[in-house]
């Protein structure tokens, strides 16, 4: 009796290129390459693709990219946070106020700022879960509250919309070395924020593809009812995100 496997001629074997193009990350990579080629070809200075030019635009892109990592995780889970951008400014403003007005060590101020940001995120998640309103609406309200508070508090406490004197705070030099220093590639200086961006991208990729929590994130974005039926802690995952 033959044990040779049977084949179904109706099933067409997909090529490597077809399989690759079906992956969403490949589409994103091709889009990034296309944009890079477009800007390089239209750059009249000729510096865009050279080290000085790359250092310039990655200095701008890195902080945005770091925020985008967190936003991307939330979007994969089927939610959206409109307040993430202003939350960055609010946290930085809070840290600046603590060190300039209260003379606090900058590391303690950073910890307080992160705890404050986590609390706002918790409130957003709690409101979304309990009001059943779209996260877009909840975080839009948070956006306006934080933006108004930023202007009001800085004007009341400093008389302007800027906070100065942070460089005099205790712990400033060590914090600057970790978060605001530079490193060299060839003869060109790059901001350390670029290294943080790459590191956090790798960490987020590992989280999504190699951990149970990453599976929960994908499950929420796919079908929340099926995810709940499969045992995914929906409320817990949304609050954490």
List where the protein language model places each region.
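Transmembrane alpha-helical segments of polytopic membrane transport and secretion proteins
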Residues: 1-30
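Interfacial loop-to-helix junctions that mark the boundaries of transmembrane helices
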Residues: 17-25, 49-59, 103-108, 180-195
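Small-residue-rich segments of transmembrane alpha-helices in multi-pass membrane proteins
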Residues: 63, 92-93, 141-150, 229
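Transmembrane helix-bundle core of multi-pass membrane transporters
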Residues: 136-211, 239-240
């Amino acid at each position: 009796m033959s044990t040779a496997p049977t084949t179904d001629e109706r099933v067409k074997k997909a090529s490597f290129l077809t399989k690759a193009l079906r992956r969403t990350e490949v589409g994103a990579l091709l889009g990034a390459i296309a944009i890079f080629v477009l800007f390089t070809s239209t750059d009249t200075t000729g510096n865009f693709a050279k080290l000085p030019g790359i250092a310039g635009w990655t200095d701008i892109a890195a902080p945005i990219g770091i925020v985008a990592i967190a936003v991307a995780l939330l979007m994969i889970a089927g939610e959206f946070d409109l307040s993430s951008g202003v939350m960055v400014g609010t946290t930085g403003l809070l840290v600046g106020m603590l060190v300039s007005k209260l003379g606090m060590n900058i590391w303690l101020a950073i910890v307080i700022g992160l705890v404050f940001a986590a609390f706002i995120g918790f409130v957003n998640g709690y409101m979304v879960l309990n009001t059943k309103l779209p996260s877009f609406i909840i975080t839009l309200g948070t956006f306006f509250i934080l933006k108004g508070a930023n202007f009001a508090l800085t004007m009341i406490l400093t008389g302007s919309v800027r906070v100065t004197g942070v460089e005099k705070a205790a712990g400033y030099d060590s914090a600057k070395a970790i978060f605001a220093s530079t490193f060299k590639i060839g003869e060109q200086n790059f901001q350390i924020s670029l290294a943080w961006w790459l590191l956090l991208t790798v960490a987020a990729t590992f989280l999504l593809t190699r951990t149970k929590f990453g599976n929960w994130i994908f499950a929420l974005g796919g079908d929340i009812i099926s995810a709940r039926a499969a045992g995914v802690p929906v409320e817990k995952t949304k609050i954490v995100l």
